[in-house]
């Protein structure tokens, strides 16, 4: 078996060596590079902040299920997992409205065409909000209808009030992510502190409320904190946008 693996490797290398790909790679290697990008000075100072911001959000979502599993049992933890999968899928779909515009936003910022930038961004944010709201409402209505008819599948999700709280948090988070994307297109990350504070407060809220009030308390606390943090993100967005655009005009 070991010889067979080595033979497939040698054959693959030989095929590359004899193909046009090898000549293309050799020509690319011979191209002289005049402009170099310093990862240490141009990329890393921005990327480590982005990494911390994303890790903070990831940390919050990964706490829900373990806490509920330990305090409320496997059934409730499974319901939370199913509900999170559904609403996160909706969030991922609706966020494509903003994520696909990142190259356009960045290009307009480079051209300093802030009027066109803001017009496009505002339209995109409205589309994102409407799409996300409609899909979240539709999901809630479907679960409510299935529960009314006692369809077993509906009881694999959280209760309707917990779902509503979670959907409020998801919708608020979508707006916060949209403003964060706008700011990051300027090659800056001013929301690092917001993200860390959000991770700590939401984490503590999850641990405390999940232990004493179950899924309903956990989702309610998360919704309240997410709305407050989104308002904070909006203030940073307004301040930084005004400051950066004034300096660059």
PLM ranges: what are they?
Residues 71-74, 185-186, 212:
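Helix-loop interface residues and adjacent transmembrane-helix termini in multi-pass membrane transporters
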Residues 38-46, 50, 67-88:
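Interfacial/gating helices of multi-pass transporter permease domains
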Residues 87-112, 185:
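Helix-loop junctions and terminal segments of transmembrane helices
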Residues 134-155:
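Short membrane-interface helical motifs at transmembrane helix boundaries
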Residues 2-6, 12-59, 112-115, 240-249:
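Interhelical loop/hinge segments that connect adjacent transmembrane helices in multipass membrane
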Residues 1-24, 201, 215-239:
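Hydrophobic alpha-helical transmembrane segments
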Residues 168-195:
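Membrane-interface junctions at transmembrane-helix termini in multi-pass inner-membrane proteins
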Residues 40, 44-47, 81, 113-130, ...:
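Interfacial transmembrane-helix starts/ends
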């Amino acid at each position: 078996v070991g010889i067979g693996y080595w033979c497939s490797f040698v054959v693959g290398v030989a095929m590359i060596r004899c193909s046009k790909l090898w000549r293309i790679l050799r020509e690319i290697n011979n191209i002289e590079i005049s402009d170099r990008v310093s990862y240490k000075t141009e990329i890393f100072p921005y990327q480590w902040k982005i990494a911390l911001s994303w890790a903070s959000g990831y940390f919050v979502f990964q706490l829900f299920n373990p806490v509920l599993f330990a305090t409320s049992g496997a059934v409730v933890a499974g319901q939370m997992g199913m509900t999170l999968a559904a609403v996160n899928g909706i969030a991922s779909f609706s966020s494509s409205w903003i994520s696909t515009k990142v190259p356009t936003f960045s290009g307009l910022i480079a051209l300093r065409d802030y009027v066109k930038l803001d017009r496009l961004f505002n339209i995109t944010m409205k589309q994102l909000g409407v799409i996300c709201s409609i899909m979240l409402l539709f999901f809630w209505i479907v679960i409510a209808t299935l529960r009314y008819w006692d369809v077993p599948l509906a009881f694999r999700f959280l209760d309707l009030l917990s779902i509503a709280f979670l959907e409020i948090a998801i919708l608020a988070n979508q707006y916060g992510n949209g403003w964060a994307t706008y700011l990051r297109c300027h090659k800056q990350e001013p929301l690092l502190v917001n993200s860390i504070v959000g991770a700590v407060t939401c984490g503590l809220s999850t641990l405390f409320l999940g232990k004493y009030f179950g899924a309903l308390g956990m989702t309610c606390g998360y919704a309240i904190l997410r709305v407050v943090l989104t308002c904070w993100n909006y203030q940073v967005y307004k301040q930084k946008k005004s400051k950066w655009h004034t300096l660059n005009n």
